[in-house]
């Protein structure tokens, strides 16, 4: 374990204080308090970037299995259910950590949690590459799941607590940007090592040096000033703030931090399920929103991208991995403008646009796949020697040839596509359609001249259908990346009062990982039963349902302070008023409580709440 200085010691607070920072958890982009005096120094920015490396590691681990599974399922002869377990074991660890990680973060500090998560990720990766077995694969993936869940919470909170108020949204968004960048790197890695012997080891091992470097760097960075205040070390907190803000007087910000900590003790965890301040409605909105994040299908596209692409015509591992790299590129390109424009366009608008485009692209993908005569069942068959394709047997079986044997590869390329069948036991009167026998000498391979009987799939996917499927998939990914990808976490950070925001975020995070686990654990089985087209149609229905939910229940918080949002949502008839507004476009006045505020405490642009007015959130520079 990496030692830390006394200011991060294990002697304070249980779970009450957690990530309810002054202005919200991950994704908060504004606040009701006056802006802090200092701007973000270069030191603050570099500290945020160092912490956000956790997002890069999280994204890499989430996207990595898409390509690694193509090799591992052959080497271990994995069944459909075993493949699902390999993918979902990471989510099991993440779900368990989401239930208990907050206590660790509160007791030992955000910075120490990031260091521990980096070390645990390296340890889990070592387990994966030391020896390939199904049991060790599950154990290593569970350890990595615990790591990424812990780092997701800790990184988000740490950056939010060291960032100046009016730059918090920008700095916290670095974590989301790092996540999608990590996914892109994972897909590039999948492609780079797709045809390399033991390429899966390189895929799993690439993150180890980066994780170690982050752990070392985080050791030399300061703890969160808010955490120091929680421990009663106000003098140390003041020193950290002066270093982060490059100003000599941090009294005002320290006062705001202490005030927000007092607010946390006004609520208990069980208040989330009571009518106090309409909290029950708020938590139901939050839980339903993260439910739609998962049930619209994005996790399966992330984990099974290469598998899905193989089923629609990208038949080689290399082609499927290259096509899935486009998914990573689209995620990065789409996330950047969404992050930069959310303060001007609004999270609700992005959610509506994203859900609408997702439903259209999923419908297109489903219709296209109805016309592709391709059996998805081969994804779920056992990848034993009797069921391996010739290419899988020659190039990926344990102990077989390396990538350097160019003469063998050149000889293999001369075999026609219709010769690349699956090994099947023959005899007993079996006469499968498309049966063929071919004889092939494999020079310089150490293999004797052998006859192979194979069963070929005579269905060839038309190029137009194959590329239309890929285009629909990329549009779907882009729509998710501007809508249900980043925006729910911004909404969640704004709809709960500061005193209970951290615990609400923890509960919704557990819901997110839990539903993700259930969806990913059954994707291959369900697709095998009903077909990829009908899976797309189900996701289309869920996308339309999410659109209706966003329109009716999600407030437009653009241009509004956190206090204004909280006052509006605290009304017992909030849902009724929101639905009535959508039906009759009636205008709602600013709550009278807000009219009593001092002029300097109000945002003049926010005359109406939840989208009633079309004002914009003030620029950070104003």
Swiss-Prot record:
The organs and tissues expressing this protein are described as:
Expressed in skeletal muscle, heart, brain, kidney, spleen, adipose tissues and to a lesser extent in small intestine and lung.
Q: Which BP terms does GO give this entry?
A: D-glucose transmembrane transport
Q: Could you state one GO cellular component term attached to this entry? A: perinuclear region of cytoplasm
Which residue spans belong to the Cytoplasmic compartment?
A: 1-44, 106-111, 163-168, 223-282, 343-349, 493-503, 555-622
TM region(s), chain numbering: 45-65, 85-105, 112-132, 142-162, 169-189, 202-222, 283-303, 322-342, 350-370, 472-492, 504-524, 534-554
Q: Which InterPro entries does this chain map to?
A: MFS_dom, MFS_sugar_transport-like, MFS_Sugar_Transporter, MFS_trans_sf, Sugar/inositol_transpt, Sugar_transporter_CS
**Keywords noted in UniProt:** Cell membrane, Cytoplasm, Glycoprotein, Membrane, Sugar transport, Transmembrane, Transmembrane helix, Transport
Localization of this protein: Cell membrane; Endomembrane system; Cytoplasm, Perinuclear region
- GO MF: transmembrane transporter activity
PROSITE patterns in UniProt = MFS, SUGAR_TRANSPORT_1
Q: Where is this region: Disordered?
A: 1-26
- Please state which protein family the record places this protein in: Belongs to the major facilitator superfamily. Sugar transporter (TC 2.A.1.1) family. Glucose transporter subfamily.
What is the role of the protein in this entry? Insulin-independent facilitative glucose transporter.
Q: What is this protein called?
A: Solute carrier family 2, facilitated glucose transporter member 12
Q: Which gene encodes it?
A: Slc2a12
């Amino acid at each position: 374990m990496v030692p830390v200085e006394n200011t991060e010691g294990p002697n304070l607070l249980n779970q009450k204080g957690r990530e309810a920072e002054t202005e919200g958890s991950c994704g908060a982009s504004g606040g009701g308090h006056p802006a802090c005096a200092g701007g973000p120094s270069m030191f603050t920015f570099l500290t945020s970037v160092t912490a956000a490396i956790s997002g890069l590691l999280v994204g890499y681990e989430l996207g990595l299995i898409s390509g690694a599974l193509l090799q591992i399922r052959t080497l271990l002869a994995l069944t459909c259910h075993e493949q699902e377990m390999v993918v979902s074991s990471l989510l099991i660890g993440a779900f368990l950590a989401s239930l208990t990680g907050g206590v660790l973060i509160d007791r030992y500090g955000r910075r120490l949690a990031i260091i521990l998560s980096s070390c645990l990720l390296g340890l889990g990766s070592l387990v994966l590459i030391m020896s390939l077995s199904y049991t060790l694969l599950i154990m290593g993936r569970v350890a990595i799941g615990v790591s990424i869940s812990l780092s997701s919470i800790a990184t988000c909170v740490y950056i939010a607590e060291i960032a100046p108020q009016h730059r918090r949204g920008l700095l916290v968004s670095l974590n989301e940007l790092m996540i999608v960048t990590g996914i892109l790197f994972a897909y590039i890695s999948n492609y780079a090592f797709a045809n390399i012997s033991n390429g899966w080891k390189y895929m799993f091992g690439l993150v180890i040096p980066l994780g170690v470097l982050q752990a070392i760097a985080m050791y030399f960075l300061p703890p969160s000033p808010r955490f120091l205040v929680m421990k009663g070390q106000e003098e140390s907190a003041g020193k950290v703030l002066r270093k982060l803000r490059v100003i000599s007087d941090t009294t005002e910000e320290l006062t705001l931090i202490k005030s927000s900590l007092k607010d946390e003790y006004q609520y208990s965890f069980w208040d989330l399920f009571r009518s106090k301040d309409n909290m029950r409605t708020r938590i139901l909105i939050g839980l339903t929103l993260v439910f739609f994040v998962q049930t619209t299908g994005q996790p399966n596209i992330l984990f099974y991208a290469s598998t899905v692409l193989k089923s629609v015509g990208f038949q080689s591992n290399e082609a499927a991995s290259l096509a899935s790299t486009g998914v990573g590129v689209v995620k990065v390109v789409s996330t950047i403008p969404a992050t930069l424009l959310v303060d001007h366009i609004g999270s609700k608008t992005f959610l509506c646009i994203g859900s609408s485009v997702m439903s259209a692209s999923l419908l297109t993908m489903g219709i296209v796949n109805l016309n592709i005569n391709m059996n998805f069942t081969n994804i779920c068959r056992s990848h034993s020697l009797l069921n391996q394709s010739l290419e899988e047997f020659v190039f990926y079986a344990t102990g077989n040839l390396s990538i350097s044997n160019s003469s063998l590869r050149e000889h293999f390329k001369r075999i026609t596509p219709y010769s690349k069948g699956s090994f099947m036991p023959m005899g007993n009167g079996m006469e499968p359609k498309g049966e063929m026998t071919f004889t092939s000498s494999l020079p310089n391979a150490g293999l004797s001249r052998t006859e192979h009987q194979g069963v070929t799939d005579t269905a060839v996917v038309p190029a137009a259908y194959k590329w239309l499927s890929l285009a629909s998939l990329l549009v779907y990914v882009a729509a998710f990346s501007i809508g249900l990808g980043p925006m729910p976490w911004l909404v969640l950070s704004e709809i709960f009062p500061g005193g209970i925001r951290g615990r609400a975020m923890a509960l919704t995070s557990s819901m997110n990982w839990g539903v993700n686990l259930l969806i990913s654990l059954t994707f291959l089985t369900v697709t095998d039963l009903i077909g990829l087209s009908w899976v797309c149609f189900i996701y289309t229905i869920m996308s339309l349902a999410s659109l209706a939910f966003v329109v009716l229940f999600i407030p437009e918080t653009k241009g509004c302070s956190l206090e204004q949002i909280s006052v509006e949502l605290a009304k017992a008839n909030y849902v009724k008023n929101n639905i009535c507004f959508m039906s009759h476009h009636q205008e709602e006045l600013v709550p009278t409580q807000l009219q009593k505020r001092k002029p300097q405490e109000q945002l003049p642009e926010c005359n109406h709440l939840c989208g009633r007015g079309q004002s914009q959130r003030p620029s950070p520079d104003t």
